[in-house]
Structures are given as structure tokens and as C-alpha cells.
Amino acid sequence: YKRQVYEVTSVLDGKLIDFKGHAKRLNRSLDELDMKNPISYEELLAVHRELVRVNNIDEGLVYLQISRGAPSDRDFVYPNPDETDPTVVLFTQNKPGLANSPLANKGVKIISIDDERWGRRDIKTVQLLYPSMGKMMAKKVGADDAWMVQDGYVTEGTSNNAYIIKNNKIITRGLSNDILHGITRAAVLRFAKEAQMQVEERNFTLIEAYEADEAFITSASNFVMPVIEIDGNKIG
């Protein structure tokens, strides 16, 4: 019943990117689902590094998934976390050119769709059916991704956080249960503030997005990508 959480950590030049942030978010997701983490931070870091080494990953990803474990019976009521050992799975993907994606140079085209996901998007679970459907909706009409819209306001992309820029101000939805607390999002906003750029964390509408000077998305596997079109409206 989707009692599984996951994290994906990028690897560049053989090094894990923002691992500490991913580990912290993993623990938060586990806590929200009343699950225990069977691996310490040091052990998890060591396993990630060993996987990168033995698989000769220079640019790529490490995928981690933790499920509640195998209960004695099929039931909506989950077993006592102190009596059931979680199941941990990790694997790597070799992705040469991860940091130099042609799509990042060209920019992505976005469509908007209704946000029909469950309410706790802040927990990074494997409950990804609707985001997957949204990505396919975009592909079918020649776009690259979809921004989801709730009550007239953009929440996020199918697997990324959404931003617009207006009058030299970066605008993105504030943290809540409505969006994933992106690790790359946190890094981008931190760098922006260090560079004394204006940042406004608030809801923004589709109309604001259509009229934006610029727009972009961020994620752990795609880093930062410019958005050049939303629902057929050219951006920038």
C-alpha cells in the first residue's frame, strides 16, 4: 500500500551530490510513515560510496528504497515497526553526460494539468502513478513535462519543483504538504540568497507563469533546467 520511501542521489565526477540533504529527507519521510531506518547515516553513506566505486559510476544516480518489510498477514493495519524489519534496496544507474543534458541547453516545454495526487506530497513515497500519467500526458502532445495546478495555483512538476522569474525576482511555492521539499530547491534558494537575489516563496498562478520573464525547474537528477514554453505560451 505504498509504504515505501525512496531517494535518488546524483553522482558527478564519482562524488555524491547533496547526500546529507537526501539522508535527512529520507529520515523525515520514514518518521512521517512511522517507519524506522535500519541503517545509520555512516553506514548508508558507506554503502552509497561502495556502490559508486564497484560500478565505476562517474556520472549517474544511486537509487535507494526502504519498504516497511514483510508483514505476517495482508492488512491495511501495518505491523509494529519494532517487530518488522524494513527491506532496503539500492541500485545504480550509469548516466554519462548527466551534467550536460542537451535538454538543459534547449529548454523544456510544459503543459498544465490538474493536481490529482494525494495530500501528503511532502513525503517521498513511491506513490507516483499520477505524476507518471502527467509525464505521459505531456509527451503525447509534444511537451517535456507537466506542471500540476491546484485551486488555480501551480504546485510543482511531475518530478521537479517549479519556479518563475518576474522583475528579477525568483518566485516559487513555499514548503508545505503540497509539494516535495526538494534538495536541489533548497540549494538553489540558498545560492540565490547568498548572491543577494530576491526570492519570494509563495503560490503563483498559471497566468503569472504565462507572463513570467523566465521560468525553470529543479530536481536532483536534472539539476536546473530552463522552461521555454507553458501551455503554448513562449517564456522569455
Each model region followed by its residue ranges:
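Helix-start/capping segments and mature chain N-termini
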Residues: K2-E50, S72-G236
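Ordered, amphipathic secondary-structure segments that act as subunit-interaction surfaces
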Residues: V54-I66
